């Protein structure tokens, strides 16, 4: 019987784009694991809620046990929205997080140069368009074409739910090129987002293949 595995957890420790795929939260604790994990969840939820339209691709959290400092790296396609005029928005965000955690927080903003090749951002874009009542097939095909034109080796997009307002939910998939999900040498980027439409939730999954790792990259 076939089993499903999360694409990111499956590739932990594998090199991607010259860097090792690592946990999105990087810290260690013998006793306060549950408390620190809950703190991470609060940080992520606050950032995603406050910067919902800023194209957040990834949030990395690092904690130093000795100093009690929290370092938050925000990867975004729209750094101007996150930083704000004269850094006002990022300063306000830092103060919010310091209030939330009662710790000193450092916020770093990193730009995603090619959002059309980032699976999470593509999934978010499709979900936003579906919430705006766009035709799902046209939206999926447009995103697929954009990814392939930008240099992807392969891409696959799947939408599941009451597509087109039908009574029974179903799934529809479009793909182009090669997307080998069982090959660890393949640099597969995965993204997921739920679109809250009037007909219910529609799940959007995106896989983008950036190519096979060479021996030099390993």
Curated annotation (Swiss-Prot):
Gene Ontology terms: biological process: translation
Subunit details: Part of the 30S ribosomal subunit. Forms a tight complex with proteins S10 and S14.
InterPro entries linked: KH_dom, KH_dom-like_a/b, KH_dom_type_2, KH_sf_prok-type, Ribosomal_S3_C_sf, Ribosomal_uS3_bac-typ, Ribosomal_uS3_C, Ribosomal_uS3_CS
Superkingdom of source: Bacteria
Source species of the chain: Rubrobacter xylanophilus (strain DSM 9941 / JCM 11954 / NBRC 16129 / PRD-1)
Family per similarity comment: Belongs to the universal ribosomal protein uS3 family.
GO MF, one example: mRNA binding
Residue ranges occupied by any KH type-2 domain in the UniProt entry: 43-113
UniProt cross-references to HAMAP family, sorted A to Z: Ribosomal_uS3_B (MF_01309_B)
Coiled coil: none
One Pfam entry name: KH_2
Gene coding for it: rpsC
Highest classification ranks of the organism: Bacteria, Bacillati, Actinomycetota, Rubrobacteria, Rubrobacterales
Record's GO cellular component terms: cytosolic small ribosomal subunit
Role according to the record: Binds the lower part of the 30S subunit head. Binds mRNA in the 70S ribosome, positioning it for translation.
Name the record gives this protein: Small ribosomal subunit protein uS3
């Amino acid at each position: 019987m076939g089993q499903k595995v999360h694409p990111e957890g499956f590739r932990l420790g594998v090199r991607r784009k010259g860097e090792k795929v690592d946990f999105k939260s990087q810290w260690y604790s013998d006793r306060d694991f549950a408390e620190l994990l809950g703190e991470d969840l609060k940080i992520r939820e606050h950032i995603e809620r406050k910067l919902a339209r800023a194209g957040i691709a990834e949030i990395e959290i690092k904690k130093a046990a000795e100093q009690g400092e929290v370092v938050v790296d925000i990867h975004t396609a729209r750094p101007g929205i996150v930083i704000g005029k004269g850094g006002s928005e990022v300063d306000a965000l830092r103060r919010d997080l310091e209030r939330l955690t009662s710790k000193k927080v450092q916020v770093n903003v990193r730009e995603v140069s090619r959002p059309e090749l980032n699976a999470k951002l593509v999934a978010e874009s499709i979900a936003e368009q579906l919430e705006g009542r766009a035709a799902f097939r046209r939206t999926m095909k447009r995103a697929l074409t954009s990814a392939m034109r930008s240099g992807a080796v392969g891409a696959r997009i799947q939408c599941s739910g009451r597509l087109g307002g039908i009574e029974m939910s179903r799934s529809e998939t479009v793909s182009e090129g090669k997307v080998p999900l069982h090959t660890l040498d393949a640099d597969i980027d995965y993204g997921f987002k739920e679109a809250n439409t009037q007909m219910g939730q529609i799940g959007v999954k995106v896989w983008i293949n950036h190519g096979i790792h060479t021996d030099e990259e390993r």
